[in-house]
Amino acid sequence: MRQVSVNRLQKGDVLGRTIFSHNGRSLLGKGVTLTQPYIDRLKELGISIVYVDDDETKDIVIEDVISEENRREAMNSIEHSAEAVRIGKDLNGFQVKKTVNNIIGDVLFQEKIFLSLTDMRSYDNQVYAHSVSVCVLATILGKALGLDKDTLEALAVGALLHDIGTVKLPNELVAKREAFTPKENDLYKMHTVHGFEILRNKPELNLLSAHIALQHHEWLNGNGYPRKLSGRHLHVLAQIVGLADFYDNLVNDGPGHSRIVPHEACEIVMGCANKLFSQQLVVTFLKHVAAYPTGCTVKLNTGEVGIVVDQNKSLPMRPIIRILIADKGLAHVRAKEYNLVEDLTTFIVSIVE
């Protein structure tokens, strides 16, 4: 299985992973042979990357950190929570805790965990998919930092609902893809306060989750919002969710900006150490996120093009590459593989989309 830009899809390509709608329903199932109308529809939905199966990469296994069932349930949970608040009802905190404990269970079950899967997002599911991805990444970081089960639960709840306050904002603002005006930006920043007010009144939820919603845009240097907290005044759980949110926003389209590839996002995160986020948190993050996700196509300094087939978790910037295309564009049949930990003179120069 490999990643393919929707713009490079061809009729006859076989979908390698199911694409879901905002409520967790299947839009297009794994194993479907793509037709031109299907490809056109994917473009209309705003999906930029999909996974395909082919003979050259059929042995490449790209596993999600959480099960497909738990990802669907989490999408449903955040949608139902948002809708409940939107119509003036209480969100079901017990259901949210059940959902995040399933995610925690998946994360704790894996001995060595590494995030190497790219989301397939459409315009209609990107808000909920973002919340789920932030929850998964925050839980991975929480486990790596040695948090106990109760604290992990508070972290995961706060991560899944970190943007719940946006339901109190105008729909057209939340759905806007262009850059915010200064006035819109000030209004948007209020989602942190709204989120805190929504969650702090839920007795079944740990108050730490409410503080995550309030503080997830605060930065170590005091230049965040809404209260410009800094240093020791920031809660570590909010910093974890803040970093997960920051990274996920970098690798996905947002208001006024286009997504960047994971290795560029990792470089930006690296530069945020001791400025936006603590050094310890950034180092932990970089040990658990693939700069070059498995299945992506890369170009090497040798001029060759290949697929990332596996990760070297001790050195995430130097994965294992299977060469598919020579420098003159001639296709190979598994001509060779580079383990970049061993081939020290070979390195990746770019991701090919």
Which role fits each region the language model picked out?
Residues 32, 75-353:
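Histidine- and acidic-residue-rich, metal-dependent catalytic cores
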Residues 1-97, 326-329, 334, 338-353:
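Membrane-cytosol interface segments
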